[in-house]
């Protein structure tokens, strides 16, 4: 029951980061068609502001959890998930939406720092490993759920539509059109208009109707699991280990009794004694705990921190979130219709879930170093395949204002699906595992927090800059940059990445 309830936080993590991919095509519609008439910069900002909030949440979530308790913190985060979902849903424009995206992002980041700890501290030993692995699986399941709901809502809407009452420029007669027909006028999609000309064209249209509000239906669904999490977590006990950290022994015993079956999990008294001894050991460590200045003044720790930050950033330079957030828009650039691209995103979600399940097996069977380096090389090759498809089979048609062949868009989709399978099967799993292994206990908090903050910051930068890059540089150059970057990263990893599997901290220290 605890796993089912607590992992709703991870489901929300996945849902809130994934839902935007289907909402953006409707947000691009004109104001009079009930969209937000986004520019590429605003599109990037909608994704980026969530990740700025997530960086802050990851930085502060652990502190909040230590002060208030895991359960109370998750309860508060459920409220933030709900408030962020409702706020973004009713936002009349992007400037009102941005702060609510930051709130939503804060909940996402803080949940990433709190939920795994709560699960690890409350789960019985016999299922602890599988429950924490399920937590990671729930994130990608949440993204798949978001993609699926987006596809259903889009299908019910019949795709983005707009009714033009009058077009002074003479491009369109009064009628109802698929918004794709209007969007094709952009130079980035093979049309004759620059971004500025296109937005000026939209402003002069007289629009009588449109279904651009569909993005609101997609976003409001985020509130349902938030309510379920808020109700469910209030029925769960606090972490017994947190109670012990606060010297509340009797509360710790009571909490443990609620989540243990003595016939399966052994003596509660014995486990409490183990926890008391572990807590005493932690106190001894805390007396020796050092700060950030100690890390920077110690050469091997400083090098280890840089390796940890590099690993965290590598988790994002794969470009995984350019697919999670923007795949439908990328597929539109490749010539696929909006409706088809929103539905096609479900395939990426399925491959992501399969990849995450494979990752649980890979990390047990192979060495961390060889898996991650192989993953990054595979990612680089796949991204260069996407770049080549754009450059040689799509860009020439855009330049000539002709329609790219249908198979080219589906080739892009196929390469994206392979990309998601590769990146989710090893990159995230390896990076998160290694960051838990390479940092010494007396500085683990500050070093891990710094690395995670850098990861979310890199995520925000990539998410914010990707839409303008696609619009100005095109898919060929944009994906070439990411592909080459990953091959360079693979070389750097080969030179600096330590192997941590089956090694003690002392052995890692000698390597560094």
Predicted regions located by residue number:
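Short helix/loop segments within enzyme catalytic domains
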Residues: 260
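Boundary/linker segments of alpha-helical solenoid repeat arrays
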Residues: 264-270
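Transmembrane-helix signature of 12-pass secondary carriers
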Residues: 1-257, 270, 276-512
